Amino acid sequence: VNLVTYKYKRKRYLSKNNQNIRRVNYLSSIFPNSKILIPFRDPIQQATSLLLQHNRFNEYSKNDNFISDYMKWIGHTEFGPNYKPIKKEITYNNYNELNHWIEQWILSYEDQLDIINNNKNILPICHEMLIGSHKYWLKILNFLEINSSYYYDFRKSKKNSILNVDKNLSKKCYQIY
């Protein structure tokens, strides 16, 4: 990371990978001066998005091996034909059902709550709070030590209608959220 920022004369490096949630403690330890943002949104909507991505990448990969090979090569195994659950101790094993992805959301964020809450260099970012809240945006800029009054008008994401969600999973994910 230091070589990349040095080479391009940049102060910041952005790594967007859904599986970074698993690595947040490690990343924080090897980059103690870093600022880590952890974006999250309504858990059922986020899980729905992951399921849709999983289905999309499976479909794309049927006709193009490069997609699967490339995603595997760069370590993106959070959906698609190379999918590996973030946590394997699960109740819902059918990757094509929403409950599986909600359970993965719960296991991912539940595991990380203490780490997130006990590190001053980690800031969770709630998508729903970001929409229409200039004050919340300024909090993020302040955390990142960015001196700017620029405001990006974040748009509300389309809500997917949800069917067949395990009520206990739903309750648990919203408690964490």
Label every model-predicted segment:
Residues 25-26, 138:
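Active-site phosphate/pyrophosphate- and oxyanion-stabilizing loops and adjacent acidic/basic residues
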Residues 16-18, 27-52:
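Conserved phosphate-donor/acceptor-positioning beta-strand/loop module used by diverse small-molecule
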Residues 51, 58-177:
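PAPS-dependent sulfotransferases, especially Golgi type II membrane carbohydrate sulfotransferases
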Residues 8, 31, 119-120:
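A structural signal for short coil/turn segments at secondary-structure junctions
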Residues 5, 28, 116-117:
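N-terminal cationic-hydrophobic initiation segments that often serve targeting/anchoring roles
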Residues 20-23, 108:
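Amphipathic coiled-coil/heptad-repeat helices and related helical stalk/stem segments
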Residues 1-14, 78-87:
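PAPS-dependent sulfation machinery
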